[in-house]
Amino acid sequence: ASDVYKRQNITRRVTQATAGDDVHGLVLLVQFSDKKFSSVGTQQAFDEMMNKEGYDYMGAIGSARDYFISQSGGLFQPTFDVVGPITLDNTMAYYGANDYSGQDVRPDEMVIDACKKAESMVDFTIYDRDNDGFVDLVYVIYAGYGESSDIDGSLEDAIWPHAWYIYQGAQKRVSVDGKYLDAYACSAELLGNSGTTRDGIGTFCHEYSHTLGLPDFYDTSGVTSNYGMGTWSLMDYGCYNGPDSDGDGYSDGSVPVGYTAYEREFCGWITIEELTTPSSVTLENLADSKKAYKIVSSDKDQYFTLENRQQTGWDRYMASAGLMIVKVDYDQSVWDYNTVNNESSRQRMTIMPADNKYSEYNEDGDLYPYNGNTSFTDDSRPAAKTNTGLKLGKPVTNIEQDNGVITFDFMGGIPAVVAPVADVATHVTTTGFPANW
């Protein structure tokens, strides 16, 4: 029953993704009895981070709202209502201490307690946009660092940024203003594990994207280290893209990578055109053209997407530019359980690197053309084969890049010829008429 319930929630979120500018997201600033926001953790600062056009803190190129407007081509224009700080009665460890399996013990209770305290300040009914009885989403930014930045065990009591459901966590129904709480996401105030630099928008955009239905594309098992999508996807390590503004040797997540073609189509923002017949293809930058292609195998759930990615805009901190080819091996249950790339022998959403090296340390060789590799065929390296060994039999050859424009031949590259369209005949006589086109 819980899995069905989860899919229903995801359906609601995807509907929200195409809601234009009629979306308000609730963001609660939450601090604990023993951990308060730093001096930079003010309501105004986070409101700007969420909503200010052209937000530029620590090298950012826009706010979270700017990011989603850009990725959706204006189809999704959320406004984030920032409330707080709200001080909870319990310590951070009460919510964030780890259980025997390494999971936070009560993060869902943090959300419940925060909403209860915010009830006098917030009209939760306006956040049930589809009027289904559930608050669409509660987002919490909590004081301090996230456990995901822990490198020495000092942050074990902190909360790990994540997206989840109240009912699945607390196993109970909780309501505010007559609306049930359920979908929530959370992330930390501060970047890294020291200093007072606010976290970039990347983590927020990543976690908020879960509420639009997208799963993680990194290995969520914590056991293996499969490559997945690396920094090429917001739903992997691309959420950390950006400059090293504080000089600690790490990017700060202030300029997260743009959505992939798959992610845009998943949210209903574009339609990826299938290549089926021989043609010579010209492909402009995805960020500008909203155009991408896919090549589908005999198993319709296994296919490859092709998109032109350039180092401009939100993609400016990518490792390289060119044609990005991504293998998709869709299984709804795997997506629902958020285990897309946990199986080493069957990663289901992963880049096909032009240099044939599946590693975050070689990402500058991932996009085509690279070092003489200008083809993606049944016999190329990497090969155009599905996870189950199906050969596409639909070669992509002669991949070139010129001035940010990608061209390639599909199945031999016969140019498309558009037949002339005849106009309606005029001056018709009993013996004939002049042809017009």
Predicted regions and their residues:
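Fold-level signature of zinc-dependent metallopeptidase catalytic domains
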Residues: R7-N51, D99-D104, G144
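Non-catalytic C-terminal accessory/binding modules of secreted extracellular proteins
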Residues: S38-D89, D150-S194, R264-P415
